[in-house]
């Protein structure tokens, strides 16, 4: 019955003691739940993921790793923020927050990140209000870092959304050059405007586009130094924040997304100069949205893979997931992210 299920969840998932629950359940029921075996449950039940997701993950992951991933996705996500290096340094911001008694620490991978051990109302903090801080998962920060944008360059965040990565890229460019922020959703770009005003950046150009084939896109063909494509995806790497996504997605919806991802990446690739850098990223856990999309573009010719582990090592970041970035909440405490870095062949 529902009451028993709730008590079982409180004991098994939340770790509540029998003493805490003795007012709500008989000792016999508590003992029965505590002693119940769960090691013989189907993997989809233990990992709390749909069967179709399990089947896709099993193509590249061991069952033990899938179980660890599923359990990590049930835990609340930490609060990560990015220090706006155009306005402040991480050391100074970290010292100020610690002096205020806040439980914070530097993120282990992103040199811009700070992690809160709890979830204070950071949107009312003076450092947030003056643009020194932006809420951004550490994994998302690393996507911007892999783009490696430099002062004075021509850069595009092709699927900018509300602009978290746009702002990180703009800070890397020290508010110089030109940074296009494309998106098909007017509401998302509207959310970027107040964040952009706080950031102090003057090199960002938000532009609403109808699709990846918009004339605003095509006119930049062959002109850009770097392009980030954080493609629309299933979002299965963000289940800590959006647990309903696993019920809203399906094999059919993922198949539709892969067609869109391939089309967007192909259009974005045309914007690069010879020697330009292209970063393809998702917050998906599925190879068909990740490696398969990258390999399809490479098969068309004209792009080579730049190993992510080498880029991270050059930036003295202690993280090695191979030649492509694969972040997991079970291993890295970030959302699930994928990224590949491609370089356009010289003319």
Question: What spans do the regions from the language model cover?
Answer:
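Class I Rossmann-like S-adenosyl-L-methionine
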Residues: 1-124
């Amino acid at each position: 019955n529902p009451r028993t299920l709730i008590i079982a969840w409180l004991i098994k998932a939340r770790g509540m003691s029998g003493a805490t629950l003795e007012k709500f359940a008989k000792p016999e029921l508590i003992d029965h739940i505590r002693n119940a075996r769960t090691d013989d449950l189907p993997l989809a039940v233990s990992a709390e993921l749909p069967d179709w997701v399990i089947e896709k993950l099993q193509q590249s992951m061991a069952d033990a790793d899938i179980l660890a991933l599923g359990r990590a996705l049930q835990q609340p996500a930490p609060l990560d923020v990015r220090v706006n290096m155009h306005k402040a340094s991480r050391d100074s911001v970290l010292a100020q927050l610690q002096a205020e008694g806040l439980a914070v620490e530097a993120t282990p991978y992103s040199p811009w990140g700070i992690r809160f051990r709890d979830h204070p109302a950071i949107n009312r903090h003076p450092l947030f209000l003056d643009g020194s801080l932006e809420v951004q998962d550490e994994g998302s920060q690393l996507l911007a870092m892999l783009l490696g944008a430099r002062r004075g360059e021509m850069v595009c965040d092709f699927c900018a959304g509300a602009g978290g990565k746009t702002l990180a890229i703009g800070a890397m460019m020290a508010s110089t050059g030109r940074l296009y922020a494309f998106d098909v959703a007017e509401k998302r770009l509207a959310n970027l405007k107040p964040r952009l005003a706080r950031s102090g950046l003057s090199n960002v150009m938000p532009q609403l586009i109808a699709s990846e084939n918009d004339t605003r896109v095509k006119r930049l063909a062959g002109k850009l130094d770097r392009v980030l494509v954080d493609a629309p995806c299933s979002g299965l790497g963000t289940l800590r924040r959006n647990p309903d996504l696993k019920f809203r997605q399906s094999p059919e919806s993922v198949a539709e997304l892969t067609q869109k991802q391939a089309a967007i990446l192909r259009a974005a690739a045309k914007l690069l100069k010879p020697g330009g850098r292209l970063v393809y990223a998702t917050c998906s856990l599925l190879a068909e949205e990740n490696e398969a999309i990258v390999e399809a573009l490479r098969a068309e010719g004209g792009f080579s893979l730049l190993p992510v582990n080498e880029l991270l090592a050059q930036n003295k970041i202690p993280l090695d997931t191979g030649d492509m970035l694969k972040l997991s909440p079970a291993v890295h405490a970030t959302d699930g992210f994928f990224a590949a870095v491609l370089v356009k062949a010289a003319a």
